[in-house]
Structures are given as structure tokens and as C-alpha cells.
Amino acid sequence: MRTKAAVVQDAAAAGLDGLFRARSVALVGATERSIWSQAAFANFERLGFTGRVHPVSRKGGTVHGLPAATSCAAIGEPVDAALLMVPEQAVAEAFADMNAAGIRNAVVLTSGFAEVGAEGARRQEALLAAARSEGVTLLGPNCLGFINYADRVPIWTTQPPLPVIPGGAIGVVSQSGATAGFIAAFAQRQGIGLSHQVSTGNEADVNVARVVDFLVDDPATRVIGLFLETVHDAPLLAASARRALSAGKPIVAIKIGASETAARAAEAHTGSLVGDDRVFEAVCRQLGVIRVSCIEDLVFTAGLLAQVGHVGDRRLGLVSISGGVCEMAADHAEAAGVAVPRLAEPTEAALRAVLPAFGTPNNPLDVTGGAMLDASLFARSLPPFGADPSLGLIACFMDLPDTAEDIAGYRGEIVRQIGAGFRASGRPAVMLSVMTRPVTEAGRALLKETEIAYLGSGVQHGLGAIGRAFAWAERRERGVPAARPPPTTAMVRPAGEQATLAYLTSRGVRATPVTLVRSAAEAVATAQALGGPVVLKIASPDIAHKSDIGGVLLDLEGAAAVADGFDRIVASVRAARPEAALDGVLVAPMRRGNGVELFAGVLRDPLWGPAIAVGLGGIWVEALRDTAIRLLPVTPGEVLEMLSELRGAKLLDGYRGSPAIDRRAAAEAVARIGDAALALGPALVSLEVNPLRATATGAEALDALAVWDEEG
């Protein structure tokens, strides 16, 4: 039996199919006095729409050269979608008319809704309620609409970049309509075609996540590009990203904003370490979303992936006619994390037989200025270069000619020889410009003739795109983690360090034993029973960071030292925090010897839910802020990836004579801490273990703190 969620997802997908593939459109509020109406109507001809367009105007008459219906109901035939361009005060009436006509897809250009404040938000809620009561799929309000380039369906209210590049494979989704236009314009200038261009605006109904979910199944779309200001449906976006990764459709995303979510995290460290932006960054790493920071990198990365797809062998061969460009490319490849291996001796020998006497067979390969005299040098050098067993992808730097005259001349011949060399090499290959430059129609024709994958990206953006494409391919090969059943719900609500450590122990996390004492004599007796040096820590529900106020003493041994330590801790804390309630003092065995202190902290993000941060712990957690983050639940394998991402990762493998920790044991402990936090339910604000002491023989929680929502 299908789940309700599956039925809802199918209904949503069907709704978007009806919208994005509409064959008849009503232009509600059509008037030749409006630039929006003029552009929207002109786009049907510009894009080659073959369906029917129905202007709707209260005054009737002729609008845009067609007879205008006075209402949607007066059109007199079924209509797939409506574009509402009426003033805000007329939207409700226009929507009711659209509903009466049985139109079940709407794009609302009109602004004046949630973006203007509380009153506008109430109007938007009423609009959404009207849409849902009639089963209407609503895009907007306050959006420019969409263009389905693949099926030639434009419900878009500004002029798109022309001419349309056929066969576009990148679906662009943006919460900002203007930014969607900027992305489309830049892609068009670079000769990179789009399959879709969608502005979601206020996202009263259709949001970015729903459009991504649609594009994952769209046959014309090979890559998805996003511009996000916020995320309105994080669970669906995460699920869609997982489906995209499984399907081999990369998602390249710009997300603006880096605000913190720490306000409700009480005094826990985790709130300052896990913020909105850092959680989104973690989501990208976890789900294979390629995050970029500018339109250029979005377009070039998506354009590269649309052309070369998944690259299995991620070792790069660099080729240029310039030694200086070769050196720049090598530097940028290293910065992008791309391996540029040395060539094998047989490859060097084969290249010596081809290159001029002054040429040197290296990777990067400078084919030398000899190619200016004999363009076939590219066609003769690329096959032996590409045959080297250490290479997986070839990147050759050469600007694409702009004009028909150049293409017919020597510059065009060089590109043709590069194309011949690429084909003969048997390797995936891409040609990159030396500096960022547009691609003309004549240039696109030459690329089609030579079957060359090309980016007019320049060296830096091009190598960055290759690095990101390689990282995405590597992430995809690791696969999408299998869904894990939620952990068994805990029936306790631990408060205080002692109870939290005991709870972690019950969930399979090794934790140091602690005993609460209320007098110096009890402290001494407990220490003697432990039979070695001890740690004393203040126990108070009002104090999270004990060491800051003298609430922790280490390595105490002997009755006198323990008794004196008890008195000193109590006196110090009472002087620093006289208002704090004191439960007593905790006594724990002192752990000596080699080891690394780690930090593991869980925080419930308001958008994405529970997330876990792992980093170097103890006093370094705030000083270094060196953490890796993932959404929960995590597997031990994912935690191993997190540990490898830390800037201080080399400390885990032994440093200056100290033994390496057991990373697998540490990862198991962190994964169990994450499961333990999930089991405590939504009232948990944060759960921290600091430090989690990792050694060559295992991992042990030495201190823990749970913070609860007082209203939960």
C-alpha cells in the first residue's frame, strides 16, 4: 500500500507537470499599457510556443492583436494555466474567476504579499487557502514566472536572453526572479543552454524543493542550478537532493546568508559552532550538492557537468600553447584539489618524437609555439598524451574564435586540430579559454562541428569547475547512505552531567564513571575507592562551563589533596556565581596518558532538524572552532569522513611521537552519541560531549551536558 507521503509527492509532481508543460495560457490583466503584459505575450512568439494564448481583460476588445475575454470563465474552453498580472487589490477576484473557469495552475506576478509585512502575509495566506481549496498549483506571488525551454513553454514576464540555445540541459531555480534572469543571461553569453528557468518568488505554494523534485525526473535536465535566500521545505529538498545524487544529476547551488542559530542554544558550545549557513554547508557535503558563491562558478560548473557528466578517473592532464598558462593552470589545479600526475616514461618518449626539439614532455604539457607554425601539433601530441595511464581527463587551454573570419582562418584550424586530438586520445576532454570570454553563435557552430566540450571560463574558474565536478563524482561514488530506522525513544530526560553520562552509557557510549558527593569526607572516600588520581568538578544545573570559574580540578591524589580540592572548588564557585544552585561535587577517575580530546555536540536546527558537530575538544573547541557537521542520523563511516575534514586531523594520526587514535572507535562513539540525542526527542535543545577522549584503544566520554527546551 502506498504511503500518504508518496501520494502527496505524486500529486505535487503532476501539478508541476501541468504547469510547466501547459498548452494553453490565460493572460489575466492583459493590457498593451503594461511592460509585463507586453513581454509575457511577446515571449510566446520568441520561444516558439505552439499552444493557445488567451488575453483576459475586463474591458474586452483586442489586446496584443487577439480578442480579449472579459473573464477566464468567458474564454469558453479549457485552459491549463493562468498568469495573473492584476493589481494586488484585484488578485482575490481574479483568482476566484480563474477557479470558476476550472484553471488549476497559476503564476502570480503581483507583489504586495508576504514580502511587505504582516498584512501582506495575511493576504498571502488567504491566497494560498483559495488555491488549496480548489487544488490549484500556485507559483508566486511576487515572481517573474518560468520558462520551460525544452518544451517551449514561457510564462515569463521579462525578455529572456536571445537567441535561445537549443538542447539546453541545465534547470535553473531561483527565489529571486531578477537573479534567475542574470544567471540565464550569463549562461547564454557563454553558449550554455538551459532546460528550465524558474522564479519561485514568495513560495506560497510551489517552492524550490518542489521544482528540484520535478527536475530530477525531467528528461531534458542533466544539471540543476539553484539560487537560494532561504529554504522553505528542508525535508523535501534533502530528499530531492538524495534522489538527484542517485540519478547522477548534479545540483549546483548558491545560498546567501550566514546567520547563526545560537540564540536558543542556552550556554552550550554547539550553538556558536552550528549556524544556519554551516548547517547548509554540511547538508551540501552530505547530500552531494555543489556549493558555489557566484553566478560565474554556478554557470561554469553546471556547464562543465552538463557536457562531461560523471568523470570516473579524476587525474588531470593540462595542455597549452603557453608555458606560463601551464604554470598558472598547475597552481589553480592544486588550489582546486585536483591531482596533476607526472607522465610515465613511455609517454614522455612518445611525446619527444612529436614535439619540437625545444619542447619538454611534461604534465602540464606545453606544446610550444611550434603549434603556431603547424596546428597539427595538437592533433599529434594529444593522443600520446591522453594514452598515459595516469590521466583521466584532459584540459586544453585555447580561446574559441569569435568571428566567421577567424573560424575560417588559422585560429579555427587550431581548434579543429584540438578536436581531432581529443577524439583520438580516447579520454574525456574539455577545452578552456585562458581568460573569461563570451561564446558567439559562430563559435557555437565550430564547437558543434568539432564535438568539443568547452568553457569560456578562463583558467581560475575553469579549474575550479573541474575540481568541483571531480568532488561531486567522488561523492556520488560513495553512494547515498541507506535510510536508518529512528533510534528507540528514550524514556528518560537526563539533567546534569552525572545523569547525562549515565544515559550515554545506557545507549552504548563508553563514559567515565562519576559520583556525586556533598562533603570533603565523601570526596575522599570516593577517591580512595577509585584507587588513583581523580578529577573534581562542580555539579550545578546553573553552570555549564565549569573550568571558567574554577569549578574543575585535575589530577588530585591523596586524602589531603582531595579534601582541600573539594573546599577550593566550592569556595571558588560560590564567589563567582553566588546565585547558582550547587548540587555538590562530582568525583571521577583521572585519565592519564596519550590521547586526543574531541568534541561532539548535537543541536536541533530550525530548518534541517538535528545536526551533529565533531571537532577538537577540551579548551580548543572555542579557540579553534575546527568542526565538521552533518545532519543526523550519521553512520560511523560518515563520521570518519567528518574527522578527515578537520584542519587538525593530523593530530588524530599521531603527532611528534604520540600514538594514533583508533578512528573507527571514535567514529562509532560519535554515531552513538548522535543516536542517543535523537532518542531524546524534540524537546532536546543540545547534547554535548566535551571532551570525548580518543586513544589508540577506544573513546570515552569524560564530560557531557544536555540542555532542554523549558517549554518542551
Where are these regions (language model features)?
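Catalytic-core regions of core metabolic enzymes
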Residues: 1-712
